[in-house]
């Protein structure tokens, strides 16, 4: 057995046994994907190993080995690559005040993924290819199609973050009425809508950031390509009524007197001229939001947010010295507009307060046309939790196939790719143990308990969340829960509240507000963009654009929990169990449980299912080729692997197997 750490071959004790546990899906915890790992073992404190671990025992050495980060590692058996992964240094054993041995553990690359992701969140990903200008052209394009320049990856779904939308074909006014009346005072306002990004692009960004590759027919599938995440980072609107978080840009003051540096666009401080205050005025349209920052020596001194024009805003400066400089910067809110800034500065010769001179400068108009930076709008969710939620929802298996490459497939597909191996000749068939599989008296599949108005009402009325599934069994076992870290939104097909109106409309929306009609944040919302809806003219709805014009609309995305806008074409849903779709108004049973979980759970609860334990002596060829999705044949009976404990030095193995049913 050979062990390599950060590319260097480590020394081993001659009598050291390294035992690996091989497991991916385990009946002891069916919601988790496991990775192969070793028992703890020791390495001698040899010259080679001391160099690898950089004399970790010596606290006086700087720049030493970082034990809280696992080191890249791989194991060879008789010069054949066995496993790639990471090695964790646990402790150094000392004897007579000298290092004797290093206690370590080895983990496969599946386990290492969580270390790689760390505490990073979705907004740490580079989604700049999906950034776009915040304007009517892009918003309207995204309502029923894709935003241009985003690689068909960004849409603007009909989900409201603040106002409770309804449809009243008689009433011409009323906050939230989206029926078209050629009146810009109500309807779907441009600032109501937030973008959504394809999950495939999030996966791509994860691969790029961490220099890994997911080899996955599942992630590349057409159905997965219809899944989007709503860019809902904070409760309320995306830009309107929100703190301005954009990075400010230097205001290029294009005219001014000699005290102002028109090349560097700043007020320099000299021995004879010390600024005491700055005042500024801004010309802007009434609806333009922006922030003015005053910087001293590249450090923000003060920030002020404004809407529309302002006059004579005073900023008193601290005592400055020669060599200091003052700059003005402007930050957009995201909703566009042009701002012209005029700046006036009083300069004093000394502390006596006698005015030496006054300096003025004026900008040309700076357009604050907002850009939607998609990463800034992503929900506050860890990358590891995002991947983990996908794994639990779709019962995915993540298996490393190379140092930075992972095979990601649903469990059933992964098992189907395994090889059947007859190992009867290597197994001690005279002695074995047989026991029942661990069973649970209740298995629950659930999303986050949403507080969005319709979802919470459904849960309170039915004692279970929309899309959740619960199964009870007559066993004296524990309860088991598979929980996904997303909100499963219950969408709404609007009904005309006018008694003589059109009745049930063709308009499908999401209401991301609470029962108290307050904005709601919750967990990230994912949904299918199942197709485009062309609505009858009698169901037309109103969009109020940035120019305060009411625009008649008949198109929108059908967003929801099913993968098609045509009932006969629905093959998948985001619900775990059978639910009535609020738009198509019929029940669909092709949910997550039936599609991705049912076969495994049904086999687990099959009356003939048993857990078998065998002892075996595996030759090198079998050890190296064995995969966790292989079927093992023993005396003409097939088994699937629950776990294998394998001594790499001796080839002795303890096989925990499930009979194939």
Cite the ranges covered by each PLM segment.
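Bacterial peptidoglycan biogenesis and beta-lactam-recognition machinery
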Residues: 384, 392-401
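Extracellular low-complexity, Gly/Ser/Thr-rich intrinsically disordered linkers
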Residues: 614-618, 622-630, 635-637, 641
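Polar, S/T/G-rich
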Residues: 1-259, 341-369, 374-391, 413-422, ...
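Extracellular jelly-roll beta-sandwich "head" domains, especially the C-terminal globular C1q domain
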Residues: 240-272, 277-365
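Minor-groove-contacting beta-hairpin "wing" of winged helix-turn-helix DNA-binding domains
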Residues: 405-410
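Glycine-centered tight beta-turn/hairpin loop motif at sheet-sheet or coil-to-beta transitions
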Residues: 78-80, 299, 634-637
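Short beta-strand-centered aromatic/proline hotspots
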Residues: 83-91, 637-647
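Hydrophobic beta-strand signal
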Residues: 74, 327, 632-633
